[in-house]
Amino acid sequence: MKHHAPARRRGFTLVELIVTLVLFGLMGATLVVFLRPAVDSWLAVRTRAALASDADHALRRMLRDVRAAVPNSIRTPNTQCFELVPTGGGGRYRMAADGVTAGSAPADPQVATTQFDVFSNLQPLPAVGDWVVVDNQNPGDVYSGTNRSAITALATPAAAHGRHRLSIDALQFPLGYEGGRFTWVPDSQKAVFYACSGASATLDGNGDAPGVLVRLKDYGFNATAPTSCPAVNGADVLATGVRSCRFLYNANQGATQQSGFVSLQIELTRNNETASLVLGAHVSNVP
């Protein structure tokens, strides 16, 4: 009877192991050399895209308020902030009594007005406590309240008289104003300030800029024109990582001087990547 010796099991020799480790090391080093720049580039592009998106969102949010603002209500203490009075809507009011149907409610500039008919379909509707503004020729008027009055009631008049009837605290409409237009301002926000706070090119340990862009609302109407940017405690934050801001406003752009021009610039920095956007728009200053 023959006995067969078990087959010898063969493994890695020390030389083979060393060669394998060396080859894997070379492959790993090669992958790092070629892949790391590609990965870093992808991460940088993603960061810049996010910065551009955040900057665009913040600028368009400001521009939406600028375009909807009460005419001539923009005030700029400096290039780091600006104030305005955004509206919720507006329309045309009745300027004379209906000569056929009795019971209309015109706004008579000769006496104080407490109610008037509205020809336009207001969407959305203002609420009791919101503010009616008429003929804002000067920036200080809407803030001081000379052409602004609180809404006390809303009603639907006869169809021949208009779409809506607004009751307001007694207000004498400006003499000589023939536009027949009004705007209304939500009492929930009143005047609004946009401000850059803490913007600086000095970055923190993560490569982020320290500034923030904020929207401050519902602080009331200040008759005195601001000379500096306000404190931003409790304000809504629109953007972080702000490196710099620059807000410029020309109230009398063009030959007719009926429209202004606003330029909004913001620069954001995060993870040592920077995106800078500029947006400009014409501003209607015709009440």
State where each predicted segment sits.
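Exposed loop/turn and edge beta-strand positions of beta-sandwich/beta-sheet ligand-binding modules
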Residues: 8, 17, 78
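Short linear sequence signals and composition-biased patches located at protein termini or domain-edge surfaces
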Residues: 198-287
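N-terminal leader/signal peptides at the extreme start of proteins
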Residues: 1-12
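Extracytoplasmic beta-strand-rich oligomerization domains located immediately C-terminal to a leader/signal peptide
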Residues: 45-214
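Aliphatic-rich helix starts adjacent to a transmembrane/signal segment
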Residues: 12-67
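Acidic/polar N-terminal loop/beta-strand segments that form early-domain functional surfaces
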Residues: 29, 87, 267
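Short helix-loop boundary/capping segments at the starts of domains
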Residues: 40, 44, 53, 64, ...
